[in-house]
């Protein structure tokens, strides 16, 4: 087919990214969302959910590494990890790079995303057959309510906070997360862009503070996400997420100990954001 252009439908961004694509590899609709896989000359294959780009082959590692490794290395000995969302398998791949991990449970409500990723993104979904991995197609909000003092790390890799993903950003959900974590457990979730979604970031942080004694925020650049300057919100019971508790001994393309330390916002600027004094 001739080159055509796909225009993203991000419900929260004031801009629209447009991608030149050479081939449509898959189009379908699951019980929960529209799913597309397209081929781009520059980005390679692209996963799109409900009109919003989730990742591209070319640069998916920025997001998956940065959502995973800061909290995994903040924890001294992460053995049991829960991933809510992340049906593409990218976070699971990064979690299982840690030798300390004995069990990683991936709970994604949409089994079609899991199957599409296995078929079209084998380098992302490559750890789904690892014997330490448990893949469940369930509602993560309901699943977590059945567990107390169970997990060392909980990572939420959700889509934008609309529709069925909205409950994963609420005070009620974070209460369940806190209860499901062990006494030194730590949580992280993607919390949108500081450029275009500052109100969401602040709301996310304040909701976490209702349950967790230690709450923080770090960022990185995600080139394909509207706003680019992407945030990740951390809730911890004991560990300071700015500090690395173990040797960085996993193979990564972007994350490193230096990246970890520099990803967190300067404390004064962080407080300025939370206090509503950062406006532009």
Swiss-Prot record:
Keywords in alphabetical order: Cytoplasm, Polyamine biosynthesis, Spermidine biosynthesis, Transferase
Compartment(s) where it occurs, according to its Swiss-Prot or TrEMBL record: Cytoplasm
Keyword field contains Cytoplasm: yes
GO MF, one annotated term: spermidine synthase activity
Annotated positions binding spermidine: 64, 88, 157-160
Residue ranges constituting the PABS domain according to the UniProt record: 3-237
Stored Gene3D superfamilies: Spermidine synthase, tetramerisation domain (2.30.140.10), Vaccinia Virus protein VP39 (3.40.50.150)
UniProt binding sites for S-methyl-5'-thioadenosine: 33, 108, 139-140
Leader sequence segment: none
Coiled-coil region list: none
Coarse class of the protein's main subcellular location: cytoplasm
EC number from the UniProt entry: 2.5.1.16
Top-tier EC class: transferase
Any one of the GO BP annotations: spermidine biosynthetic process
Record function comment: Catalyzes the irreversible transfer of a propylamine group from the amino donor S-adenosylmethioninamine (decarboxy-AdoMet) to putrescine (1,4-diaminobutane) to yield spermidine.
Family membership: Belongs to the spermidine/spermine synthase family.
Subunit comment: Homodimer or homotetramer.
Designated name of the protein: Polyamine aminopropyltransferase
Organism classification: Bacteria, Pseudomonadati, Aquificota, Aquificia, Aquificales
